[in-house]
Amino acid sequence: DTAFGAGGSPLETLERVFLAHVAFVARHPGVPRILYHELQRPAGAAAQVRLRTMVSGYRARLARLVGDAKAAGQLSGTLDADAAAVHLIGAVQGLVMQATLFGGERGMPQAARRTWALLLDGLRGGRG
C-alpha cells in the first residue's frame, strides 16, 4: 500500500510497486512458498479463496495504474491493462522461482531492476 500511495507519475508508481513487491519477497522468501503450498489445497479451501481474492485485488490495482499511465501518455495507448497486470505479477513470480531454484534471494532486487527495464520496453510498445 505504501508503494501505491507514495506519489509521483503513474509509471513511477508502477515501477515502485514492482520493485517493492520483489523487495518484500527477497526479505521474506518463505512467504511465496507458503502461498504456493496453499494453492495445492482442494478448490474452495478458505485460505485458497483468501489468496485468490488478495491477488485479484492486487491485479486490479495494477491494471488501474497501467490505465492511468496510458491516459498520461506514459505507456502505449493500445496496451491491454489487464494483460499487463498479469505479466507484472508473473514477472515477480518468475523472479521468485529463479531465486528458489538457485538460492538467490539477495540478488532479487538487482534482477528486478533489470527485469523492469525489459518490461518497460514492452509496456511502452517499442516507443522507447
What are the language-model segments listed below?
Residues 23-27, 64, 68, 88-106, ...:
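Amphipathic C-terminal alpha-helical segment
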Residues 26-46:
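Amphipathic alpha-helical segments used for helix-helix packing
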Residues 1-31, 81, 85-88:
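Hydrophobic alpha-helical connector segments
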Residues 27, 45-72, 82-86, 113:
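Amphipathic alpha-helical packing segments from all-alpha helical-bundle domains
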